[in-house]
C-alpha cells in the first residue's frame, strides 16, 4: 500500500488542509484530514489554504499564500516557518538538494531557499538579468517567451528549472529559455519531473 498527501483549503476560510489518502486494493481511502492554521493569522489570505507541498523526510514544507511552514508528519504541528516580505501568492514548491524552489506567482519570481542558511536567491522573471537569456536577434518569436503568472515549478535530472505557465498555457525550461511541448488548450497548473519524464495537469483537466 502507498499513501498520498494532498494539500488544499476552503474558499471561505484561511486555514490550510493536509489530507492523507491511502491506496488500497479496494481503492482510495482517506486516512486523515488535518487542518493547519496559518502561522500568522493577521496576514492570512482568505480562500488560499495550502497551495503547494514538498516532502522532506518526516516533515513537509507547505506554502500558504505568503509564508512557508515546515509541518511534522507525526502530529501535523508547524515546527518552523520561512518568511519574506516579497512572498506574494506562493504556489507550487519543490525540494532539490536541500533547497526549496518556490513559484512566487504574485511577485513574478522563482525563489530558491537554502535550507541550511534560510538565504533566499530570487530570480526576477521580469528583470533584465533573466531577459539576457533571450537571443539578441531571432526571427522566431516562439523563442522569446513572455513570463507572466507561473503556476508550478520542478527540477529535471539536468537541474534545469521547469515552469508551468498560466497565461501562455505552456511549459518553460527557464534555465535554457526554451518552451517544452506545444501550447495547450487551457492553463498549465501543475508540473512534475518523474523518472525522466515531465508530467503536468491543466485547468481543463488534461494530464
PLM region spans:
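Surface-exposed loop and turn segments in beta-propeller and other repeat-based domains
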Residues: 32-46, 82-86, 120-148, 179
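Short loop/turn segments that connect beta-strands within beta-propeller blades
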Residues: 72-76, 114-118, 174-177
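Residue-level detector of Asp-centered blade-edge/turn motifs that repeat once per structural unit
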Residues: 55-57, 95-98, 155-158, 193-196
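Beta-propeller domains
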Residues: 10-40, 62-76
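Beta-rich catalytic cores
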Residues: 24, 48-49, 89, 106, ...
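Conserved beta-strand position repeated once per blade in WD40 beta-propeller domains
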Residues: 51-52, 92, 152, 190
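Structural signal for beta-propeller blades
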Residues: 18, 28, 68-70, 108-111, ...
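Conserved beta-strand positions in repeat-built beta-propeller and related beta-rich domains
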Residues: 6-16, 21-22, 61-65, 102-107, ...
Amino acid at each position: 500500500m502507498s499513501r498520498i498527501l494532498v494539500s488544499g483549503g476552503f474558499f471561505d476560510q484561511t486555514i490550510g488542509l493536509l489530507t492523507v489518502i491511502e491506496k488500497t486494493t479496494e481503492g482510495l481511502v482517506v486516512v486523515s484530514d488535518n487542518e493547519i492554521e496559518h502561522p500568522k493569522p493577521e496576514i492570512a489570505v482568505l480562500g488560499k489554504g495550502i497551495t503547494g507541498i514538498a516532502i522532506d523526510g518526516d516533515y513537509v514544507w507547505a506554502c500558504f499564500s505568503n509564508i512557508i511552514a515546515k509541518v511534522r508528519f507525526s502530529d501535523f504541528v508547524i515546527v518552523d516557518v520561512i518568511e519574506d516580505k516579497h512572498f506574494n501568492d506562493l504556489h507550487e514548491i519543490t525540494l532539490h538538494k536541500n533547497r526549496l524552489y518556490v513559484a512566487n506567482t504574485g511577485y513574478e519570481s522563482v525563489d530558491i531557499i537554502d535550507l541550511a542558511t534560510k538565504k533566499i536567491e530570487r530570480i526576477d522573471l521580469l528583470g533584465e538579468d533573466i531577459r539576457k537569456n533571450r537571443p539578441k536577434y531571432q526571427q522566431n518569436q516562439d523563442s522569446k517567451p513572455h513570463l507572466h503568472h507561473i503556476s508550478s515549478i520542478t527540477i529535471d535530472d539536468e537541474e534545469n528549472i521547469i515552469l508551468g505557465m498560466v497565461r501562455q498555457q505552456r511549459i518553460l525550461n527557464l534555465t535554457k529559455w526554451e518552451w517544452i511541448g506545444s501550447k495547450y488548450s487551457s492553463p498549465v497548473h501543475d508540473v512534475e519531473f518523474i523518472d525522466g519524464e515531465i508530467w503536468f495537469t491543466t485547468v481543463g483537466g488534461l494530464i
